[in-house]
Amino acid sequence: MRIRSLFAALLALVMIATGCSSDGGASAGDGTWPSEITFGFVPSAEQESLQDDIQPFMDVLSNALGIKVNGVVTTDYTGLVTAMGTGKADLGAFGPFGYTLAQQQFGNMEVLIQAVRYGAATYHGQWMTNDPSLCDSAPESATALENTAKGVQQVGALDAVALQVGVYFGDSGKALGESVDAGDVSPGSSCMADLAKIKGKRVAFTSESSTSGYLFPALQLIEAGIDPVNDITPIFTGGHDAAVVAVYNDDADVGVSYDDARRSLRKEKTDVGDKVIVFNITSEVPNDVVAASTLLPASLRTAIYNAIYAYLETDEGEAVFDETYGWTSIRRAVDSDFDVVRQAAEALGITEPLG
């Protein structure tokens, strides 16, 4: 992807974030801005890799706001919840479940930003397997599963909302036949299968505080009459890419992740779309968010939103966020949109961060 001039991006960000004020980000009418803030992230990929991925964004955000922004990757969702709740982080990039638990437990934060992916403010979790015999019919290449008014339906990979493994953006939009340094990427395969078939299987979840990596899938299992603790062998991998790896390497029979986390492996494992088959999906989940401490001045919170929005409008920002979290834009978040997550947690009896 062509990267625009970083200088031009920085200049635009500074103007938008500060409202073209000559005072920069030193202070505002609703309170003095701190000299530095900390932005916490949860690893959806390997922790060390994510730390490297977010650093360019931290540098740009620091320049846009006129204050230092430190990026910190916590070990898991619980670590970020604790960091935000105890004031060790001022901003946090949360999954929807992590946000609702943190807000419920500490109450000293508000949802500021909601991710938008390819025009959608919701997504779903996907069930994956390396065993084609689990499928009701033969897996089909270059397909995906989507929630529709008629229930879960198989669609072409180009028609899926989320960008699927093996799909890339060409000059005319989405296209099949992505190539990486390691070779041509196999388009993702999917099939339909009943969740009742996974009883007794090794299941790779991500984290107990992950919405698509545990909460919604666990609720699905209960609704299917399967105990997510005793009727399967649960494995917590710590990340969405790690869950895909577990299925790919046959360390688990089944795995769950966001749609389509298989893309995170495509540069090293070009056949991941063939070997890891999507066979079911969860109901729709509100996209992840950035929550901000209520101790931050309102003007700073607004400037943060504007700066992130502007950065995503640059080629560099688009590339960084797509590679790290798959975000293509953002919108103002509304807390009530996450009631569906709270209801799912209540159904499972989860009222505080796990771990």
What are these regions (language model features)?
Residues 96-107, 217-223, 248-249, 253-274:
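A ligand-binding cleft/hinge motif common to bilobed small-molecule-binding domains
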Residues 109-120, 231-233, 266-284:
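Short beta-strand->loop
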Residues 21-24:
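Bacterial signal peptide processing site
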Residues 14-19:
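C-terminal motif of bacterial Sec signal peptides marking the signal peptidase cleavage site
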Residues 33-37, 45-56, 292-355:
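An extracytoplasmic/periplasmic, membrane-proximal ligand-sensing/linker region
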Residues 115-209, 213, 222-224:
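A conserved helix-loop-strand patch within extracytoplasmic ligand-binding domains
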Residues 73, 78-92, 101, 105-106, ...:
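Short helices/loops that flank or line small-molecule/ion binding pockets
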Residues 62-73, 88, 160, 164-183, ...:
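A local structural motif
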